From Swiss-Prot:
This is TM2 domain-containing protein 3. The chain crosses the membrane at residues 180-200, 216-236. Residues 1-29 form the signal peptide. It is linked to Alzheimer disease: Alzheimer disease is a neurodegenerative disorder characterized by progressive dementia, loss of cognitive abilities, and deposition of fibrillar amyloid proteins as intraneuronal neurofibrillary tangles, extracellular amyloid plaques and vascular amyloid deposits. The major constituents of these plaques are neurotoxic amyloid-beta protein 40 and amyloid-beta protein 42, that are produced by the proteolysis of the transmembrane APP protein. The cytotoxic C-terminal fragments (CTFs) and the caspase-cleaved products, such as C31, are also implicated in neuronal death. It holds the Pfam family TM2. Widely expressed. Residues 201-215 are cytoplasmic. InterPro entries: TM2, TM2D1-3-like. Glycans are attached at residues 87, 122, 140, 157, 169, 179. It comes from Homo sapiens. Keywords: Alzheimer disease, Amyloidosis, Glycoprotein, Membrane, Neurodegeneration, Signal, Transmembrane, Transmembrane helix.
């Protein structure tokens, strides 16, 4: 009986050991899998790399470069292409020389076709607003009356031409006489006044419809108004209603 109990106890002890080992393996495997899952879920701090863009290279072309001929004579460059050291102590109307340098991005040559940056220009001592009218361009006005006594003036903004050199500001205001045309011809107005003046055709042509209606319904003022208009249009006293000049 005792011999049968001992093997039974040994078997139970062996089963307990195997059960303990199996539970230990299960627990240890679960912890490892949980740790692995946690590591996958939370990978920890990550490194971020910031890409610093390269500084954009300036490729803009200055607007004045479009006016500057490439590899031309430096002395013939437009005024917008050069910087000159000027002074206002020169004598008006006398020749004077100034030291000049080309602006950035401008290339020019001397008389020997060698690249040049600094040079001398010759000009007449006078301010830009003292130039002849052929050396600058001014804005035109179509809102003033050209046929008036005394003649009307209007404020204009004038700009010196590119190839002309002068002292002071190259853009300046100036009062100019009204001098614009609306497309009316003096010969046409005179011909209408002679042939169809009794019906007011000359006045209608010039845009003076009120006077035209008066001549039409009065048959040219019985001829008197027609003769007067022929004289007034002939000497240029009667002009277009918009205040412009004849062509």
């Amino acid at each position: 009986m005792a011999g049968g109990v001992l093997p039974l106890r040994g078997l139970r002890a062996l089963c307990r050991v195997l059960l303990f080992l199996s539970q230990f393996c299960i627990l240890s495997g679960g912890e490892q899998s949980q740790a692995l899952a946690q590591s996958i879920k939370d990978p920890g701090p990550t490194r971020t790399f910031t890409v610093v863009p390269r500084a954009a290279e300036s490729t803009e072309i200055p607007p004045y470069v479009m006016k500057c001929p490439s590899n031309g004579l430096c002395s013939r460059l437009p005024a917008d292409c050069i910087d000159c050291t000027t002074n206002f102590s020169c004598t008006y109307g006398k020749p004077v020389t100034f030291d000049c340098a080309v602006k950035p991005s401008v290339t020019c040559v001397d008389q020997d076709f060698k690249s040049q940056k600094n040079f001398i220009i010759n000009m007449t001592c006078r301010f830009c607003w003292q130039l002849p009218e052929t050396d600058y361009e001014c804005t035109n006005s179509t809102s003033c009356m050209t046929v008036s006594c005394p003649r009307q003036r209007y404020p204009a903004n004038c700009t010196v031409r590119d190839h002309v050199h002068c002292l002071g500001n190259r853009t300046f205001p100036k009062m100019l006489y009204c001098n614009w045309t609306g497309g009316y011809k003096w010969s046409t107005a005179l011909a209408l006044s002679i042939t169809l003046g009794g019906f007011g055709a000359d006045r209608f042509y010039l845009g003076q419809w009120r006077e035209g209606l008066g001549k039409l319904f009065s048959f040219g003022g019985l001829g008197i108004w027609t003769l007067i208009d022929v004289l007034l249009i002939g000497v240029g006293y009667v002009g277009p209603a918009d205040g412009s000049l004849y062509i």
